[in-house]
């Protein structure tokens, strides 16, 4: 599944267009590599997403085309959440 679609389906980012913009800005890495919106992701991949003043590391646990809102968080597991220091 494309990265931008996964981010939207999992509700890590609300809209696919916003997910695409975040990817274009280089704020997401997949397994340590800066990712584009079209990067294919699979179970076991590690995403690091820069949200404003924090870095969130998640592992993809499941990939589905559609899920209900209540089940969206079952697609990933948050591994780490840390603030970004001012020097970065």
Curated annotation (Swiss-Prot):
Record's protein name: RQC P-site tRNA stabilizing factor
Domain of life: Bacteria
Family of the protein in this entry: Belongs to the RqcP family.
Function of the protein: Key component of the ribosome quality control system (RQC), a ribosome-associated complex that mediates the extraction of incompletely synthesized nascent chains from stalled ribosomes and their subsequent degradation. RqcH recruits Ala-charged tRNA, and with RqcP directs the elongation of stalled nascent chains on 50S ribosomal subunits, leading to non-templated C-terminal alanine extensions (Ala tail). The Ala tail promotes nascent chain degradation. RqcP is associated with the translocation-like movement of the peptidyl-tRNA from the A-site into the P-site.
Subunit annotation: Associates with stalled 50S ribosomal subunits. Binds to RqcH, 23S rRNA and the P-site tRNA. Does not require RqcH for association with 50S subunits.
Pfam family, one: S4
GO biological process: translation
Originating organism: Halalkalibacterium halodurans (strain ATCC BAA-125 / DSM 18197 / FERM 7344 / JCM 9153 / C-125) (Bacillus halodurans)
Keyword Zinc-finger: no
Domain S4 RNA-binding: 1-67
Listed Gene3D superfamilies: RNA-binding S4 domain
UniProt cross-references to CDD domains, sorted A to Z: S4 (cd00165)
A GO MF label: rRNA binding
Entry keyword set: Protein biosynthesis, RNA-binding, rRNA-binding, tRNA-binding
InterPro entries: RqcP, S4_RNA-bd, S4_RNA-bd_sf
